[in-house]
Regions:
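Terminal, non-catalytic protein-protein interaction segments that mediate quaternary/complex assembly
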Residues: 1-173
Length: 173
């Protein structure tokens, strides 16, 4: 997706309305969520613990920002989703989203700086994909806002590339 924004990151379905997408994106970006929200939105089918990327997310985001500021041409700005070493039979730790790679490029037309992302997914159920697309948009937005606050540059959201090694129709396929 050449320019990733809220419009093209929002895919509404029976499983994911805008409120539900926003809840999961905020949670997975490390924002605080209430017990009421957890009870209202979280279901095993929507991803369960396997789709929970929030562990240590504040530190992961800070690391990306530090990398982009101090090594702007580097490829060190990576968020890894697993929480540590996991065994193949630990379903909750077998995160579908494995890594998000962030990098900066210059827009050739107007020389603005763009924040881009490539997402690498171990597996992706098509019916869960809207949640992941919206999460990637949200984390890009969070990183972009923090970059703009911590630097004198003006960054805009750029491209998103979605890599999936195994694509299945539903979560239980």
């Amino acid at each position: 997706i050449q320019i990733f924004n809220k419009d093209n990151a929002t895919i509404l379905t029976d499983l994911f309305d805008l409120e539900t997408l926003d809840y999961y994106a905020r949670k997975n970006c490390g924002f605080e969520v209430s017990k009421t929200e957890i009870d209202k939105y979280e279901t095993e089918y929507r991803g369960g613990l396997q789709g929970d990327y929030s562990s240590e997310m504040d530190a992961k985001i800070d690391n990306v920002i530090d990398s982009l500021i101090n090594y702007p041409e580097s490829k060190r700005a990576v968020v890894m989703m697993n929480n540590g070493w996991w065994a193949h039979d630990d379903t909750d730790e077998a995160k579908c989203c494995r890594e998000l790679h962030f990098f900066l490029t210059e827009n050739y037309n107007d020389k603005t700086m763009l924040l881009n992302c490539s997402g690498i997914f171990r597996a992706q159920a098509v019916d869960i994909m809207p949640k992941n697309f919206y999460f990637v948009y949200k984390i890009m937005e969070v990183i972009n806002e923090k970059l703009n606050k911590q630097t004198e540059s003006k960054y805009l959201l750029g491209s998103y590339t979605h890599f999936v090694t195994i694509l299945v129709p539903t979560r239980y396929d």
